[in-house]
Regions:
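Nucleic-acid endonuclease domains
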Residues: 1-55, 59-146
Length: 146
């Protein structure tokens, strides 16, 4: 059961985790450096990446549906998408999906869309539905919150 579904069953409102918390959590678990300068256009830096894709953008979801948009100028090479789950009362775990920017461009262009701004607005894509559920990612890692 997903975290938001469990919260909804007990009469609560869906969870929205602070972005800074999610970015710091992923940085800690993945051994990244957390970047706190928004002007740089990415969230984390991987000092151990040998492919030279060291700049990482973090997006997340606590429910089934997610809609993400991207800055007009993309400064990163890897997207880490985080899905949070709550399977039991004592353990909350999450998955981190590693998606290359080239994969995002290829998949959105197949459907005649773009991640870049058009008609004065940024397009929104569902990373879960349009990429992850279709197996469009490089790697998946699972972690426990506690």
């Amino acid at each position: 059961m997903e975290l938001n579904e469990k919260i909804k069953r007990i009469g609560g409102r869906p969870s929205v985790l602070p972005t800074e918390f999610v970015e710091a959590l992923v940085a800690f678990k993945m051994n990244y450096w957390k970047i706190d300068d928004m002007r740089l256009g990415f969230d984390c830096y991987d000092p151990n990446d040998e492919k030279n894709e060291k700049r990482i953008e973090i997006k997340y979801s606590t429910g089934r549906m997610d809609y993400s948009s991207f800055a007009p100028k993309i400064e990163w090479g890897i997207l880490n998408f985080v899905k949070f789950y709550n399977e039991s009362p004592i353990e909350c775990y999450f998955e981190v999906y590693d998606i290359g920017i080239d994969m995002i461009f290829e998949e959105t262009e197949k459907f005649g869309r773009s991640v870049y701004e058009g008609y004065g607005r940024r397009p929104r894509i569902s990373i879960s539905r349009e990429l992850i559920e279709r197996g469009i990612y490089r790697n998946k890692k699972e972690f426990s919150l506690f």
